[in-house]
Amino acid sequence: MVDFAGWSMPVQYSSIVSEHLGTREGVGLFDVSHMGRVVVEGDQAAEWLESMLTRQVRDLSVGRSRYTLITGVDNTDETVQCDGDPVILDDAIVARLANLEGGGHRFSIVVNASNRPRVVRWLKACLPQEGVRLHDTTEETAMIAVQGPLVFGRVQEGILEGPLRNVFSSEILEKVAALKNYGVLETEFDGKPVLVSRSGYTGEDGVEIISSSLSAVMLWERLLEHNTTRPCGLGSRDTLRLEAAMPLYGHELCETTDPFSAGLGFAVNVDGRNFPGADGIRIRRGAGGRCRVGLVFDSRRAARTGDHVLLSEDGTESVCGEITSGSFSPTSERGIALAVVDRVVGNPGQELEVLVRGTRLPVKVVSLPFYRRSHQ
């Protein structure tokens, strides 16, 4: 167990490799209750979030979610304003829930554990005097990710036989299985509301379930009762997301990251919008001389964050980038890494070197992601 943003978290239950491969081949169960969970609601909730997030939300249908960035400006903690150098406070998933009975809008936002205090403080500071309410539900809820090709199991006599069958009725399970990627469903477990999202952080099919903290142990135990399911810790979650080329705050993005160079341009809608730091991000669009790439080693050795990427040409050597995340890949059985490099050396097939603890290791640029599931 390790401390992670104030939460006691397991790095592994058995081994990182076995948990990783178990998720790729069966079902991995992840307690991700450390992630921050916020509910935003009110008559002006959609309009307010439209002014706070880098992705549009007014066109988000009920029952749908999307990836976004939460931005501020260079003095975010002191002053609420939109002008100034952009600061990326976090990346997040925003979901549109069923409207309130009185007609107001409801949204769920999931943020990173380490950034939750600052993000919640910033959002609360930006709230209008009326029309929007924000509630940090992290302490009163839990979040469990169920990931892998056998999450829904196989159909036996018209019934899905995966671990979710231990949690939901056949009728609800059919609705969950019918969700498209980033679809969400509000339902119940143990007589209490739950939010089920067809999403994850592993590159596999699966769902993430937000439940009452009072029901979390029962939910976890019910899911573990299925013979395809195994518990997984932070270690395998990181290697799985790396193979899927999913960004991690503090690695692929930080306060000063240019989202376009980091491969996150899809998460930024700047045209005609004025979220915090929008002007600064608009200036960066198209101006970046760097790009995010995948690097594959020809051995099991792995680079670490901050290691230099080198280009050797005509007898000279120059630093052309740096590693943002690196690890041994249990699926391919060799080292892989995400890096930000000069755009001129970012094409697939480009041969480079990485300086790992004083040793130059050859790498090749490859298309991302490193792993793409074959079972759709």
Enumerate the language-model features and the residues they cover.
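Glycine-rich, Trp-frequent "lid" loop and neighboring beta-strands that shape
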Residues: 93-96
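Conserved, structured C-terminal
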Residues: 3-4, 8-11, 17, 79-82, ...
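Acidic, proline/glycine-enriched N-terminal capping motif
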Residues: 1-77, 81, 87
